[in-house]
Amino acid sequence: GPSFCKANGKPCSYHADCCNCCLSGICKPSTNVILPGCSTSSFFRI
């Protein structure tokens, strides 16, 4: 099954949300196509 975000329990496929899916706790922006599993910088969506 899909991995889930530690912060809100949503599937990591919801890149629009600031999910703590990475071990480093970095958020995953939906625009990240090179590294879909992790962002290279913090990304917050209000």
Curated annotation (Swiss-Prot):
<keyword id="KW-0528">Neurotoxin</keyword>
<feature type="modified residue" description="D-phenylalanine">
    <location>
        <position position="44"/>
    </location>
</feature>
<comment type="function">
    <text>Iota-conotoxins bind to voltage-gated sodium channels (Nav) and act as agonists by shifting the voltage-dependence of activation to more hyperpolarized levels. Produces excitatory symptoms when injected intracranially into mice and is lethal at higher doses. Exposure to frog cutaneous pectoris induces spontaneous and repetitive action potentials. This effect is slowly reversible. Natural peptide (with D-Phe) is active on nerve, but not on muscle. Synthetic peptide (with L-Phe) is not active on both nerve and muscle.</text>
</comment>
<keyword id="KW-0964">Secreted</keyword>
<feature type="modified residue" description="4-hydroxyproline">
    <location>
        <position position="29"/>
    </location>
</feature>
<dbReference type="GO" id="GO:0005576">
    <property type="term" value="C:extracellular region"/>
</dbReference>
<feature type="modified residue" description="4-hydroxyproline">
    <location>
        <position position="11"/>
    </location>
</feature>
<dbReference type="Pfam" id="PF08088">
    <property type="entry name" value="Toxin_19"/>
</dbReference>
<protein>
    <recommendedName>
        <fullName>Iota-conotoxin-like r11b</fullName>
    </recommendedName>
</protein>
<dbReference type="InterPro" id="IPR013141">
    <property type="entry name" value="Conotoxin-I_CS"/>
</dbReference>
<dbReference type="GO" id="GO:0090729">
    <property type="term" value="F:toxin activity"/>
</dbReference>
<dbReference type="GO" id="GO:0017080">
    <property type="term" value="F:sodium channel regulator activity"/>
</dbReference>
<keyword id="KW-0379">Hydroxylation</keyword>
<keyword id="KW-0738">Voltage-gated sodium channel impairing toxin</keyword>
<keyword id="KW-0800">Toxin</keyword>
<comment type="similarity">
    <text>Belongs to the conotoxin I1 superfamily.</text>
</comment>
<feature type="modified residue" description="4-hydroxyproline">
    <location>
        <position position="2"/>
    </location>
</feature>
<dbReference type="InterPro" id="IPR012624">
    <property type="entry name" value="Toxin_19"/>
</dbReference>
<feature type="disulfide bond">
    <location>
        <begin position="21"/>
        <end position="38"/>
    </location>
</feature>
<keyword id="KW-0872">Ion channel impairing toxin</keyword>
<keyword id="KW-1015">Disulfide bond</keyword>
<keyword id="KW-0208">D-amino acid</keyword>
<feature type="disulfide bond">
    <location>
        <begin position="5"/>
        <end position="19"/>
    </location>
</feature>
<feature type="disulfide bond">
    <location>
        <begin position="18"/>
        <end position="27"/>
    </location>
</feature>
<feature type="disulfide bond">
    <location>
        <begin position="12"/>
        <end position="22"/>
    </location>
</feature>
